[in-house]
Amino acid sequence: KAPARTKASPPVSGEIIWGFAMDSLLYSRTLNQWMTHAGVDVASPKGTEVHAVFAGTVQAVYTDDALGVTVEVESKDNMLAVYANLAAEPPVREGARLNAGDLVGTVGDTAISECGDKSHLHFELYRSGTPVNPEEYILFEKAQ
């Protein structure tokens, strides 16, 4: 029997307010439409520090039209973490090496597509280019 995989620490403290939904549709009040959701939204106050969930290299830092200020970090085992809705001017640059727990940025309000939701981090995880449910890899807080 294979040993259980140890889950990583979450990028930010808070409860998931929007779950991963690639096989079903969620209703976006902001966009007034049904849509899939390739990540999770973790409720956290604006300005809260966001930390790397695993060691890796910063692949991109950019502003996405829908998800706002975004940082992508790729691990050596082909996992890509996408941290979005960050505050402007994250402290990391493309090519930077990060360890698990290093500062990626802070929660912002730059995601136009999710501005109707409470303050949160939008977090996506990909394995070999395919979106995977972050809750299978990260130990997030559960609703009380």
Region locations from a protein language model:
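Conserved beta-strand positions that form and line the central face of beta-propeller blades
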Residues: D41, E72, V82-N85, T106, ...
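Residue-level recognition of beta-strand microenvironments
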Residues: G19, V61-Y62, L86, V107-T110
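Short acidic/polar mixed-charge low-complexity motifs
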Residues: T48, D77-M79, T130
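Short alpha-helix capping/helix-loop boundary micro-motifs
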Residues: S44, E89-V92
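Flexible glycine-/small-residue-rich
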Residues: W18, S44, S75, L125-R127
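Surface-exposed, glycine-biased beta-strand/turn segments
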Residues: K1-L67, A100
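Conserved, short, structured surface segments that act as functional micro-motifs
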Residues: A96-Q144
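Zn2+-dependent peptidoglycan hydrolase active-site motif and core
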Residues: V53-A88
